[in-house]
UniProtKB/Swiss-Prot annotation:
Name of the top EC class for this enzyme: lyase
Amino-acid biosynthesis found in the keyword field: yes
Xref: Pfam families: Trp_syntA (PF00290)
Catalytic activity reported: (1S,2R)-1-C-(indol-3-yl)glycerol 3-phosphate + L-serine = D-glyceraldehyde 3-phosphate + L-tryptophan + H2O
Protein purpose: The alpha subunit is responsible for the aldol cleavage of indoleglycerol phosphate to indole and glyceraldehyde 3-phosphate.
Cellular component aspect of the GO annotation: cytosol
InterPro entries in alphabetical order: Aldolase_TIM, RibuloseP-bd_barrel, Trp_synthase_alpha_AS, Trp_synthase_suA
Originating gene: trpA
Keyword check for Lyase: yes
PROSITE patterns for the chain: TRP_SYNTHASE_ALPHA
A molecular function GO annotation: tryptophan synthase activity
Active site, per annotation: 49 (proton acceptor), 60 (proton acceptor)
Protein name as it appears in the record: Tryptophan synthase alpha chain
Family note: Belongs to the TrpA family.
Length: 269
């Protein structure tokens, strides 16, 4: 059983949803980013998505684009992101880490080398937003062969004809993007999310995590009553942007994570 399978199974037994937190690797700098990463589990994060900075983050809203820019300006590379996971794993062998980003940096790094190093570092899953199922052979197949889950995004515009193809080789969990568009924009109604999850469950037994637009403990609690996982990214990244220094960024991100975790746990079904 993979770390992701284990974590979702444990939470299902507890009768609650997972808090899935997103931060960009290297934002606002390597050391502060690593401190945030190491602090997230104790602050209540059940699964961590770690963004791989890329110069053209087309699916991301302004907050995460700016986070990517800060990370790249601070010298973050894919090699450093993998090193960050290695350092995290020294003290934490249980919290799943999912790398999220775009295919280009992985292609440049070399797929075979990336998969080998990601596995060795302790990466549990990948979300590659610009790699559709038609290109499974390029990364999804070798990643899954190495024991790394490949997590698919589905959206309100993914129709019933397309869903089976998208979900066919998915593993770990399904990431439902509750608002079509870029990250951090708007939020979906609970009625819409309820319908969407019911539709997804007709096609998959995988846990379903819902993200995009969730910013407050109250919103997190509302989604936690419906989904297997609640994904929060832009709200955490905004705390880094607003902080006066790296120390404040660490403190504020972990404080918000703790509040979100309280919301998710209060919604135990």
């Amino acid at each position: 059983m993979s770390r992701l399978e284990q974590r979702f199974a444990e939470l299902k037994a507890e009768g609650r949803s997972a808090l899935v937190t997103f931060v960009t690797a290297g934002d606002p700098g390597y050391d502060a980013s690593l401190e945030i990463l190491k602090g997230l589990p104790a602050a209540g994060a059940d699964v961590i998505e770690l963004g791989m900075p890329f110069t053209d983050p087309m699916a991301d809203g302004v907050a995460i684009q700016l986070a990517t820019l800060r990370a790249l300006e601070a010298g973050q590379t894919l090699a450093k992101t993998l090193q960050m996971v290695r350092e995290f794993r020294v003290g934490n062998q249980t919290t799943p880490i999912v790398l999220m980003g775009y295919y280009n940096p992985i292609h440049r790094f070399g797929v075979e080398q990336f998969v080998a190093e990601a596995k060795e570092a302790g990466v549990d899953g990948l979300i590659i937003v610009d790699l559709p199922p038609e290109h499974d052979a390029e990364l999804a197949t070798p990643a899954q062969a190495a024991g790394i889950d490949f997590i698919r995004l589905t959206t309100p515009t993914t129709d019933d004809a397309r869903l089976p193809r998208v979900l066919e080789r998915s593993s770990g969990f399904v990431y439902y993007v509750s608002v079509a568009g870029v990250t951090g924009a708007g939020s979906a109604t609970t009625e819409h999310v309820t319908e969407a999850i019911a539709r997804l469950r007709r096609h998959t037994d995988l846990p379903i995590s819902v993200g995009f637009g969730i910013r407050t403990p109250e919103q997190a609690a509302a989604i936690a009553r419906l989904a297997d996982g609640v994904v929060v990214g832009s709200a955490l990244v905004d705390k880094i942007a607003q902080a006066k220094d790296a120390g404040q960024a660490v403190k504020d991100v972990l404080s918000l994570c703790s509040a979100l975790a309280d919301g998710v746990r209060a919604a135990r079904v």
